[in-house]
Design a protein with these regions (language model features):
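C-terminal structural segments of small proteins and small subunits
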Residues: 68-100
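A short, glycine- and basic residue-enriched loop/turn
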Residues: 18, 51-54, 97
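Conserved beta-strand core positions
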Residues: 2, 11, 44, 74-76
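Short, glycine-/small-residue-enriched flexible loop/hinge segments at domain edges that mediate gating
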Residues: 34-56, 79
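Alpha-helical transmission elements in cytosolic ATPase-linked domains
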Residues: 28, 61-64, 84
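Aromatic/hydrophobic pocket-lining residues that form π-stacking "cages" and hydrophobic walls in ligand
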Residues: 33, 65
Length: 101
């Protein structure tokens, strides 16, 4: 579900096209996040342009990623939020705790 590339010291993570982050995928995505983050810190850009839908389980997975990033000293930036996802982030005031480009 996630694609990972290291470019110039930045870990670039993106969702596969037409992805949804809901109850069915949240556990798998959380496990992938753990594998990416464990170890030394760094910079991560999570490109969400292909993420069409996020439910409460998906929000939980993203909050878990944020917690992991803080624990392992990663600088996390979210990018390319679709309008519906951005609206959800604004409604839940997640834009106040995530760095979003």
């Amino acid at each position: 579900m996630l694609q990972v590339n290291n470019v110039g010291g930045v870990t670039k993570v993106s969702f596969e096209p037409d992805s949804k982050l809901n109850l069915a995928q949240a556990s798998e995505v959380k496990a992938e996040f753990v594998n990416i983050v464990k170890g030394t810190g760094g910079r991560m850009e999570l490109d969400m342009k292909n993420l069409e839908y996020v439910d409460s389980s998906g929000v939980g997975a993203l909050l878990s990623l944020l917690r992991l990033c803080r624990e392992f000293k990663w600088d996390l930036t979210l990018m390319g939020l679709q309008p519906s996802v951005r609206e959800l982030f604004n409604l839940l005031q997640l834009h106040t705790i995530f760095k979003i480009k």
